[in-house]
Each structure stands twice: as structure tokens, then as C-alpha cells.
A protein has these predicted regions:
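N-terminal secretory signal peptides that target proteins for export/translocation
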Residues: 1-16
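Sec-dependent signal peptide hydrophobic core
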Residues: 12-26
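C-terminal motif of bacterial Sec signal peptides marking the signal peptidase cleavage site
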Residues: 29-33
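N-terminal mature-domain region immediately after signal-peptide cleavage
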Residues: 35-253, 267-268, 354-411
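Non-transmembrane alpha-helical segments in soluble domains
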Residues: 246-249, 259-262, 346
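Secretory/export targeting leaders with adjacent low-complexity proregions
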Residues: 260-270, 278
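Extended amphipathic alpha-helical segments with heptad-repeat/coiled-coil character used for oligomerization
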Residues: 272-326
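Long, charge-rich alpha-helical interaction segments
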Residues: 330-360
Length: 411
């Protein structure tokens, strides 16, 4: 037993240096991604970088299939995740914090453990999302800005790589999801920099920040202020934020199915001081905000609340919208975190009677996008997306480059 404990401790100590965020053979997904002045990758992007913790040939083939969607700029990549990422085992593992997620990845997705170089990173987040029908086609849409301000120890902004991850698990639903590579210490250009260990690409299915599946169900996560969520209901297994999102994309076809799944688990996060809420929508036009609440801000949020509504709850940013949190410092009445963005989103939806085209939706995201000159402490817009839930398609711009888009489709 002592040897087993020593082995696990060695695994944890090795993996703790790799930054992780919050939480089967695949078919090739259809992807178009280019602009007039870029040369999209027609195949895997060549690299000399090693994956030192991976020995299995199928895993290595998958890692070396990564594609740079701008040729060789190192800003946005695509991967087909073609090996088993063992979701059912992850759900039974009881992943409840960053450390237990690291342990799961080490024990189940890696082949060997070595020490890796770490970075000192600070970050601030502030995201935006909304849902509405398309006024011309009748398709259902979801808009999303992912805002995250990665900084190094000298407070310089760290440029990130976006990674689009296609999955098609045996017995589960096909999906495409999006990952901020900096959460595993990857900077822009990491794949061909000659030094980054590519092993942490094995963790990608559990690092998603938003995504859509074959049924047109989409989910995103947004930051809240305050203590991290810690549910402790008897008889329920614990689940970490991004593991929950992976579960929803793999198993839920609608918002209602997603809500039923979430209710079976104790949600847990460990980022201090921060919690999260989910914004989700589906191809039937349903949408919801899921929050974990506790009006006593000295305690951890522990009550799951489901919130829907045509006006105030059709969009969301970074404060609690649950009435139970309304009189707290982090609720709608007093919080300033994302309030201006929320007002812009709500007004934009109201003015269009909650009916927008995809282009109008992207313009609305543009209005609430954040750069170095605005809301410095709450985020930096890394990517903006319009999800067409009906067509299972995502149109993305990165870094507020609105004239250049990347399109992803789940078939």
C-alpha cells in the first residue's frame, strides 16, 4: 500500500506542474476554416515536438494529427480526438477539483509520468452569451464570447492557442468543443516551438469551455465572483465543471436532458475566489442558465437553480441572475462584473424583438468584446462564436478579428 501511495504521489507531483482548468474511435468531422490571405492546413502540421508522457501508437498518431488552421501561425488548431477518453470512468472517479482531474488524466490517459516545467500564471475572466431565433431562417442561435486575460509573472499578456476538439465516442454523441490551450501551459505556436511537451493534448476532452453536439445542444461556462461551488448531497457523486460539460455534450440531446443529468451529481469547483454558471441552448429553441447559489457569501454555493425567461434571462455575463442572490454583492442588483456588457446584450436583443440574423448576432458580440483598453481586470476576448444549433454549425472569430472567420460543423 505504501508503494502504491508513493506512486500516486509521484504522479500528482509530476502533473501538478501542468496547469489544468476547472471540466473510442471517432469519425472525421467536416471542417472549413480559412480566409483569403491564409493557407489552411490540408493535413497534419509537421512538428518535431515530443509527447514524452505518451507511448501508445494510436495516441501518438492522434497527437501528431493536429492541424494549424492558418498554415503556421500557431493561433488556432483543430484535432480529431480518436482514442477513448474514458468518460464513464471519469464520472465514477469522483473528480471534484483540479488535483483529482490531474490524477485521472495521469492514471487513465497518460502512459508514463515525467516532471515538466511550470509557469507562473495569473488570469481574470469575463464572458458573455445569449440565445435567440434567426429572424430570416427560423434556425436557433447561441452567441458566445470567451474572455480570459492570461498574464505571466510580469503581468504581460500571454497569447493563447485555441484548439477545436472533435470527438465521436462509442455509444455517445459526436461534438466539437473549444479549448484555451494556456490552461495546460501552451502558448501560441506551442505545437512547433521545438520545446513544448505535447503530452497534455491527451487532456483536451476535459478542458472544454464551450461546444455543440450532433443534436444541436450547446453549452458554455462563464465565471462568477465569490466562493467556489461545493455541493455535498448524500448519495450523489462529485463532478468537476469541465467534466460535467463533457458529460453533457456526450449524453444530452436537449436542455431538459442536460438539466436532468446535472441534477444527479454534486457540482464542485476549486478556483478561489471564483465560481461558474452554465448557459445552454438547443435546436428546439429551449435555453437555460444553471447556477449554484448560496446567499450567505461566507459559505460555498450549494443549491442548483435553473433559470429561464424571455427577457432578463436570455443573456448572461458574470453576475448571478438567480433572485436568491439578488441582494448579495455578486447578484444582479449590486454586482458590476459584466453589468455593462449585460445591458448591451439585453438592449440589443430587445431592439430586435429577440430575433437576430447570425451576422447581427456576431455584431452584438462585437459590441461586448473586450480588449486591452476595456475592463482590464475581467477579461480579454479570445474568441467569439455564433452557434447555429439547427444546422450544428459554429462560426468563430478570434482576437476580435471580425473580418476573418472559421467554420466548424458536426455531422
Amino acid at each position: 500500500m505504501r508503494k502504491v501511495t508513493k506512486h500516486l504521489n509521484g504522479i500528482i507531483n509530476a502533473m501538478v506542474r501542468c496547469q489544468l482548468y476547472v471540466a473510442s474511435v471517432a469519425m472525421m468531422m467536416s471542417l472549413t476554416a480559412c480566409s483569403d490571405d491564409d493557407e489552411p492546413a490540408s493535413g497534419p502540421t509537421p512538428t518535431q515536438n515530443e509527447a514524452k508522457m505518451v507511448l501508445d501508437k494510436d495516441k501518438l498518431a492522434m497527437i501528431y494529427s493536429l492541424r494549424d488552421l492558418e498554415g503556421n501561425k500557431g493561433r488556432i488548431y483543430e484535432m480529431d480526438y480518436t482514442v477513448d477518453y474514458k468518460l464513464d470512468k471519469a464520472l465514477n472517479f469522483g473528480i471534484h477539483d483540479t488535483q483529482s482531474l490531474k490524477m485521472f488524466v495521469a492514471l487513465n490517459l497518460m502512459d508514463t509520468i515525467i516532471s515538466t516545467k511550470s509557469m507562473n500564471i495569473s488570469y481574470d475572466a469575463g464572458c458573455s452569451a445569449f440565445a435567440c431565433p434567426d429572424k430570416t431562417s427560423g434556425d436557433y442561435l447561441m452567441g458566445r464570447n470567451f474572455d480570459f486575460n492570461h498574464k505571466d509573472q510580469n503581468s504581460n499578456r500571454i497569447p493563447i492557442p485555441v484548439i477545436a476538439v472533435h470527438t465521436a465516442p462509442a455509444g455517445g454523441k459526436k461534438s466539437v468543443s473549444f479549448v484555451d490551450g494556456q490552461f495546460v501551459d501552451y502558448k501560441s505556436g506551442f505545437y512547433t516551438d521545438g520545446e513544448s511537451d505535447l503530452s497534455m493534448l491527451m487532456a483536451l476532452p476535459y478542458l472544454l469551455l464551450d461546444g455543440i453536439n450532433e443534436n444541436g445542444f450547446a453549452v458554455s461556462v462563464l465565471k462568477l465572483d465569490g466562493n467556489p461551488t461545493q455541493q455535498q448531497e448524500t448519495g450523489k457523486k462529485k463532478i468537476f465543471t469541465t467534466v460535467a460539460m463533457r458529460m453533457l455534450l456526450d449524453k444530452a440531446g436537449t436542455v431538459q436532458e442536460a438539466l436532468t443529468l446535472l441534477d444527479k451529481y454534486n457540482m464542485c469547483t476549486d478556483n478561489v475566489p471564483a465560481s461558474y454558471h452554465f448557459f445552454m441552448a438547443d435546436a428546439k429553441g429551449d435555453y437555460a442558465i444553471v447556477e449554484y447559489t448560496n446567499p450567505n457569501l461566507d459559505e460555498n454555493p450549494n443549491k442548483m437553480e435553473i433559470l429561464t425567461g424571455n427577457d432578463t434571462l436570455r443573456c448572461v455575463t458574470n453576475f448571478y441572475v438567480a433572485p436568491s442572490m439578488g441582494e448579495t454583492a455578486h447578484g444582479m442588483k449590486y454586482s458590476s462584473h459584466g453589468m455593462e456588457r449585460y445591458k448591451i446584450l439585453r438592449q440589443g436583443l430587445q431592439e430586435k424583438n429577440y430575433l437576430l440574423t447570425s451576422d447581427e448576432g456576431m455584431n452584438l458580440l462585437k459590441k461586448v468584446a473586450q480588449g486591452p483598453e476595456s475592463e482590464l481586470t475581467t477579461g480579454f476576448t479570445q474568441w467569439s462564436e455564433m452557434y447555429n444549433l439547427t444546422k450544428r454549425r459554429v462560426t468563430m472569430s478570434i482576437l476580435r478579428e471580425w473580418d476573418k472567420t472559421f467554420s466548424f460543423e458536426v455531422k
